């Protein structure tokens, strides 16, 4: 009996020690280098924000970098966090169940530069300026150093107008995948205070329009993502940031055409991505003319894009800046040899289309050297004529060169007629009407004369 009792006591002690060991292992500590420290608290079923950090954080240098992750836990409320040494602190609460954040939550970490609150259940009412208040000194709340804020994949409809009052250094804001629907007045006021913003992600926010002056205060904006929304045209409001905007992503919108009004004012745009737009059928004349600094164009995965005007790059060919053009996975069959100076490209993508291998394509691929711009293993194939179906377009030869097929051109569209043709048509119709009137007048006069003579 004595031995059994002793055995039970030993077992209890061992269990307590094991549990204590696990309790101390809630977060793992790693030191990538002498100036960096990572506190990994991810996937531990953590339900509450800890009151303090592991002791190892006390030894980080003042100019060190600290990363703290709570990815994929069960935290519902973000309470006030303990202070963390280091000149740059990043914290991730991604993929929790957060529904509330207390005031002064990050007050003890004024060097917080990166905060990820994505994939939670945060509403717009939860996001208040008070949660980003810095240290309280001389009766005034200071600011925190926040540069990147990710609040994507939440339940945000609107932003508090003072939300960014204490984050003057904010340069990257991710609002994607929230049910915003309308950029209301208070949301626009909030954005207007983030004057140092360089990156703005509004993808999949269910918006269909942007007020004209929405971005007029964002004089440093360089990158914006408007994908996955309900835009029928490219928002004209982008012209307000045309001098600074360098990257525009405009995928998955119900736009039917691109034209000379689509990119007005975007003179400094470097990279443009327009893809996965199922309704896009046509790229019209002078569409890309305003893009005088464009280097990379992604015009891909538009299932119904059949036509690109030979003047789509009108005015740019003499001062050509484009280095990479991707036209993959559209519904194109033909391109004009004059569309662009193909030999000036560094990379060209054309795969996944239904190419008619004719004289125009021969000129583009072989004579102008476009065939040397394809990435290895990404060479496009011929779809027609039947004789060349399945062949690489680089195998097109002069021995088989069918007539250029212009069935893609809409010949009945009024815009296709030249002014002189319209003028001659009007004159012709007018002459027919005049002749008809003269004949009618002659017949009536003859009838009156004949009737008068018959009565006499």
Where do the PLM segments sit?
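Extracellular leucine-rich repeat
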Residues: 2-456
């Amino acid at each position: 009996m004595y031995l059994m009792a002793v055995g039970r006591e030993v077992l209890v002690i061992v269990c307590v020690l094991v549990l204590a060991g696990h309790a101390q292992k809630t977060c793992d500590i790693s030191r990538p280098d002498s100036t960096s420290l990572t506190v990994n608290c991810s996937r531990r079923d953590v339900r509450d924000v800890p009151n303090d950090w592991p002791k190892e954080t006390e030894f980080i240098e003042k100019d060190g970098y600290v990363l703290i992750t709570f990815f994929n836990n069960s935290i519902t409320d973000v309470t006030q966090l303990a202070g963390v040494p280091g000149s740059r602190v990043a914290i991730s609460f991604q993929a929790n169940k957060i529904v509330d954040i207390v005031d002064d939550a990050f007050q003890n970490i004024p060097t917080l530069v990166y905060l990820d609150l994505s994939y939670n259940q945060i509403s717009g009412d939860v996001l208040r300026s008070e949660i980003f208040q810095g240290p309280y000194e001389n009766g005034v709340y200071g600011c925190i150093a926040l540069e990147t804020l990710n609040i994507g994949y939440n339940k945000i409809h609107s932003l508090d107008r003072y939300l960014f009052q204490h984050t003057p250094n904010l340069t990257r804001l991710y609002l994607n995948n929230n049910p915003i629907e309308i950029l209301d007045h208070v949301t626009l006021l909030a954005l207007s205070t983030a004057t140092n913003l360089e990156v703005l992600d509004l993808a999949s926010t269910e918006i269909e329009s942007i007020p004209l002056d929405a971005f007029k205060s964002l004089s440093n904006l360089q990158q914006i993502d408007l994908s996955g929304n309900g835009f029928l045209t490219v928002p004209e409001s982008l012209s307000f940031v045309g001098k600074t905007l360098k990257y525009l992503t405009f995928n998955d919108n119900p736009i039917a055409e691109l034209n000379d009004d689509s990119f007005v004012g975007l003179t400094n745009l470097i990279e443009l991505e327009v893809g996965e737009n199922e309704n896009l059928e046509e790229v019209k004349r002078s569409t890309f003319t305003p893009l005088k600094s464009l280097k990379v164009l992604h015009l891909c995965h538009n299932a119904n894009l059949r036509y690109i005007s030979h003047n789509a790059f009108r005015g740019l060919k003499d001062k050509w800046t484009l280095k990479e053009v991707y036209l993959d996975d559209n519904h194109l069959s033909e391109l004009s040899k004059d569309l662009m100076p193909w030999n000036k490209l560094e990379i060209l993508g054309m795969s996944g289309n239904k190419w008619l291998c004719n004289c125009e394509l021969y000129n583009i691929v072989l004579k102008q050297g476009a065939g040397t711009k394809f990435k290895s293993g990404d060479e496009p194939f011929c779809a027609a004529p039947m004789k060349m179906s399945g062949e690489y377009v680089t195998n097109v030869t002069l021995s088989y060169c069918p007539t250029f097929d212009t069935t893609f051109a809409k010949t009945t569209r009024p815009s296709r007629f030249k002014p002189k043709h319209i003028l001659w048509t009007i004159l012709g119709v007018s002459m027919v009407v005049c002749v008809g009137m003269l004949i009618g007048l002659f017949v009536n006069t003859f009838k009156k004369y004949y009737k008068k003579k018959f009565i006499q």
